[in-house]
Structure formats: C-alpha cells, structure tokens
Swiss-Prot record:
GO terms for biological process: nitrogen utilization; uracil catabolic process. One of its GO terms (molecular function) is hydrolase activity, acting on carbon-nitrogen (but not peptide) bonds, in linear amides. InterPro entries: AB_hydrolase (IPR050471), AB_hydrolase_1 (IPR000073), AB_hydrolase_fold (IPR029058), Pyrimidine_utilisation_RutD (IPR019913). Gene3D superfamilies: alpha/beta hydrolase. NCBIfam families: RutD. Its EC number is 3.5.1.-. This is Putative carbamate hydrolase RutD. Involved in pyrimidine catabolism. May facilitate the hydrolysis of carbamate, a reaction that can also occur spontaneously. It catalyses: carbamate + 2 H(+) = NH4(+) + CO2. It comes from Agrobacterium fabrum (strain C58 / ATCC 33970). Keywords: Hydrolase. Pfam families: Abhydrolase_1. It is an enzyme of class 3 (hydrolase).
Length: 261
C-alpha cells in the first residue's frame, strides 16, 4: 500500500487518516492537507488498484477488504488511535472500521456517504458502467465531473477539468478494478447496525449532490448515536473540493478542542 504522511511530526501530534472515494487517489485531499497540517499528522493513501498502490482489487471481501488495507497502514505506523475522514466509498471504509475496531477511531467524518446504497445512486452507477463498457475510458472519465461538481463550479473551472480528464485517462485504474469497486460500494449495507457505532461522527452532506441523495446522510445522522449533521445547500458530491474554506472550517470545529478553533 502506498501511503504518505504530512503535517506535524512531533510525537504528541494527533493523527487523521484520509480515505477518498471511487477514484481512490490520495491527491483528492489536497485542499484539506494544508488546512490540517498545523494541527495533525495526516496520513493519505492510494487505494488498492489505484494510483501508486496499483494491483488488482480482490474479487471478494468488498468494503471490508478495503478496510483491511487501511488497518495494514495503521499497523505499519503503529497507530493506537486516529481520526478518520472518508469521502463516499472512503466513508464506508470508515464505518466498517468503526464497527470492527471501534477503539481505533477517535472521531469519524463522513462526506456524502451512506449506510445502504440508494436506488438513485444505483441508476447513476449503471450509467457510468454502460459508458465504460460501450463508449470506453475517455467517455467514462469525461462524464465523471458531472457526478462530482455543481454546474456553476464546472463552468468556472474548465481548464482544471481538462487537466483532470487528461490525468484520469492516462492513469486510469482499469475496467476490472472500477467494476469491482463499484460492486463493493453497491453491496455495502450496515443500515441495521448504525446504532452499534458509538464514536463521535460528523456527517457532511450537500443538497445538490447528484450522485448520492442527501437523504442518505440524514439516515446516517439519525442512526448514529453520537453524530452531528452538517447539511450544505451547495457544493455537490465533492464539496470538500468545491467549497474548501467552508468545509475546512466546519471540519476543524469538529476535530479540535474549542480553544483551538
């Protein structure tokens, strides 16, 4: 597993581990690394089958197998406790760890995640799979921003989107890996077990998320006993990228003691 450590290096530094969504890249968290660096040791990683980790996503194990990869990193760094932040699929990994190894996680942050996949999200993934299988990698990558960002934001960031498209095609994780990762997140269902998770959780959702209805986050906030809900009107699925200042402020309010915010 390829992982990187950023931020504080002192022995007393609290650690936060960041897990991205379907794309699996540690680069997803660049807007958060700067905001967190003064306060935390930050661990980012490329999911199995993606980026510098590479390899194949296993055929079995689903989200739990992805969580095991995180636990491998935790073991390598000798972490006894850490905060965990996950976006979408990454949030599912955090929920899995919170169920299996609750003492490891201090505070958990879930961004546009879910306890059970929504039928609308299923339709979106069906469309993306059909694009990949019938139109190829270029079409799949070019469509991806439509599910991530608000239209107004995309209109103002055309050069960035063009760079992201080129990078996404050049470093595509492979059809088999994409399909296995989508299958894993669609099969994930811990809805009946939310009450077992006693960790403090910040649930972040956006009303304009095209991919994951914000009602899935309402369900998380309802079912998780120690949750706080941050529901935003604008920002879409990748709100930590499109609204970084607003997101980072709320994130630090949740993670830091009151006298440090």
């Amino acid at each position: 597993m390829h992982f990187e450590v950023h931020g504080r290096t002192d022995a007393e530094a609290p650690t936060i581990l960041l897990s991205s969504g379907l794309g699996g890249s540690s680069a997803y968290w660049l807007p958060q690394i700067e905001a967190l660096s003064d306060h935390f040791r930050i661990v980012t990683y490329d999911h199995r089958g993606t980026g510098r980790t590479g390899g194949e996503v296993p055929t079995e194990g689903g989200i739990s197998a992805m969580a095991d990869d995180v636990l491998e990193i935790v073991s390598a760094l000798n972490l006894e406790k850490f905060h965990f932040m996950g976006h979408a699929l990454g949030g599912l990994i955090g929920l899995d760890i919170a169920l299996r190894q609750p003492r490891l996680i201090d505070r958990l942050v879930l961004i546009n995640a879910w306890s059970k996949a929504d039928p609308h999200s299923g339709r979106c993934f069906d469309v993306r799979i059909e694009l990949l299988e019938k139109s190829g990698v270029d079409a799949f990558v070019k469509a991806q921003p439509l599910f991530l960002y608000p239209a107004a934001w995309m209109s103002e960031h055309q050069e960035r989107l063009a760079r992201d498209d080129a990078h996404g095609v050049a470093h595509f994780q492979g059809k088999t890996n994409v399909l296995r990762r989508i299958a894993a997140l669609r099969a994930f269902d811990i809805d009946a077990r939310l009450g077992e998770i006693g960790n403090p959780v910040l649930v972040v959702a956006t009303k304009d998320d095209l991919l994951v209805p914000y009602t899935r986050s309402l369900r998380l906030a309802e079912g998780l006993p120690q949750s706080e809900l941050c529901l935003l009107d604008f920002g879409a699925h990748a709100v930590n990228i499109t609204e970084p200042d607003l997101f980072n402020t709320r994130l630090l309010q949740f993670l830091l003691p009151a006298d440090q915010t």
